[in-house]
Structure formats: C-alpha cells, structure tokens
A protein has these predicted regions:
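Subset of outer-membrane beta-barrel
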Residues: 1-298
Length: 298
C-alpha cells in the first residue's frame, strides 16, 4: 500500500532474473515512485498517497515482452487519536502491452540434431503479434503500530476486469483474477534499535497457489545504518536467503532462490533466481509543512 514509509517521497527499483542458468531466463525490471499529499489538510495520522509504477518483462530469449505502466492512489484512515490502529484502501489502474516475435523463437523444424539452427526455415508465418489492454487492481490493509511494534494484514485483487489477453483477434482469453493475502510484523529488540521481522504471503490464481513465509533480523550498527539478514521459504519450491543494508534513507537488498524441486536438475543445479531491490526515501525540510503532525504508520 502506498504511503507507508518514513519521509515524503519514495523511489523504488527492482530487478529479477529467474532461471538464468537454463539458457533463456525470465527477466523482470520495475521502477516506482510514490508520495504523500495534503499532509496539513487531512486529519492527523491519516495518509493520502499517489504514485506511478512501470514494469518491463521478457522471456523466451526476448521473444516475449511485456510493458506495464500504472498509477495508484491510496488513503490510510487512523481509527483512533494516537494513530495506533489504521485502515487503508488503495486502487491501481494501468495500461499493459504484450508482444511476441516468432522470429526470435526456435521451432522443432530448426533442430539439426545437435542444436537449433536459426538459418533453417521454421515454416511459421505468424511474424510479430501484440495485445494491449487496461487493467485494474485494488487492495485493503489493516495496520497496528506502537513505538516498538508494528503488525499488519492485507488483501488484494488483481485483474479485476479479467481483460482479454489473446493475441488472436478472433479468439478471447480472459486473464484470471489473482488474489493475495499477506501479513507481517516488526518488533524492536533490545535498547539498541535492532529489529525482528516476520511475514507471510498467500496467492491464488486460476487454481494455482503460492505460499511464502519468512523471518529477517536487522542489526543496528549505527544511528544511520542497519544490516539485514534473513530467509523466506516458498513452500514446496525454494528457500530464499536475503541480505540487505540501510543507510539513512537508502536501502538495498539481495535475495537468491535456492531451488529444492526437480527443476534444479534441468541442465544444471545452479538454476536459481536472484533479485536486487532498492529504495530511496526523501524527506522535505520540516518548515515546508508547518502544521505537519503525521509520522510513520507502517
């Protein structure tokens, strides 16, 4: 949910390469920005946030590409005067474009006995195809916060309108809605600002499910810096160790998927995925918001 951060602006970026050792990895990049609006015109502890996000994804050695651009808006309502209990609702609307270029793909007729030869004819005449559509998502979040404890639980629904994503004009294939439920907590441990994080995620789409849970610990090495380490487990699939560093408003994290299913035997045992994430929080000088009383909600 947008707006849940210390500061006034947040810039974020993420890069993920999946199954890189298999020869044709899935590559996903995202970039986002969100900010809080009208802090002096809404009730204390409430947060009104807007943002934008872009996503670029490619697979099949670049033969399939997708681009998503979206805008989001959310509002957090404090349920009591001290801002400990909060309820938020958010919406996201975006434009998505999918393209597949058959000239970048290999077909059975191009196999020469030892590998694929792109100079051999594929006998396919599809060429390049594209499909664009509008997409809508929504989510809810409840958060409880004190000085030393934060707990949240949320749910969201993606692809609410089930847009048609078929590349063929005379056929229709509706993108199934995806449902998620997530929960987590943060606890301050001891007097030096160390932190313990717990979290879990459940996703469902068209009969497929994914269940993750994990734990991380943040070691405060100074007033400006914290070092993080932890691990997630994607049930029945992979272990995801994680390390990270926060310095003032900048945070970077790195995780790697250690595959523990039969997929690890495809070509090489080094078939995991890695992910790099970055966040930058920017705070305006306080004299800009002369009556600003808000703070971090989550």
């Amino acid at each position: 949910m947008g707006g849940y951060f210390d500061g006034d602006y947040r810039f974020s970026a993420n890069f993920r390469q999946q199954w890189w050792a298999a020869g044709a990895p899935f590559v996903t990049s995202t970039a986002g920005y969100d900010t809080k609006l009208m802090p002096t015109k809404i009730p204390e502890h409430d947060i009104f946030s807007v943002g934008v996000m872009g996503l670029y994804d490619q697979s099949l050695s670049g033969g399939f590409k997708s681009v998503d651009v979206s805008a989001n808006v959310s509002y957090n309502r404090s349920l009591n005067e001290d801002g400990q209990n909060n309820f938020a609702i958010g919406f996201q609307a975006g434009y998505a474009s999918r393209a597949i270029n058959y000239s970048d793909l290999d077909f059975a007729t191009q196999f020469n006995g030892s590998g694929f030869d792109t100079n051999l004819p594929s006998y396919e005449t599809f060429g390049s195809m594209r499909r664009s559509y509008l997409d809508i998502n929504a989510g809810l979040l409840y958060a409880y916060k004190t000085d030393n404890t934060e707990v949240y639980v949320g749910a969201s629904m993606f692809h609410i309108g089930n847009p048609n994503i078929s590349f063929l004009k005379d056929q229709r294939y509706r993108l199934p809605s995806r449902y998620t439920v997530h929960a987590g907590s943060r606890f301050v441990v001891g007097d030096n600002g160390n932190e313990l994080f717990l979290g879990g995620l459940y996703m469902y789409q068209a009969g497929a499910t994914e269940k993750n849970f994990g734990i991380a610990y943040g070691l405060s090495v100074s007033d400006e810096a914290t070092v993080y380490a932890g691990s997630w487990y994607r049930i029945g699939d992979a272990i995801l160790p994680y390390v990270g560093l926060r310095y003032n408003g900048f945070q970077v994290g790195f995780s790697y998927d250690v595959i523990n299913t039969a997929l690890k035997n495809y070509g090489t045992k080094k078939n995991g995925s890695f992910e790099l994430s970055m966040n930058l929080l920017v705070t305006r000088p306080r004299n800009v918001y002369t009556n600003y009383k808000g703070g971090r909600i989550f």
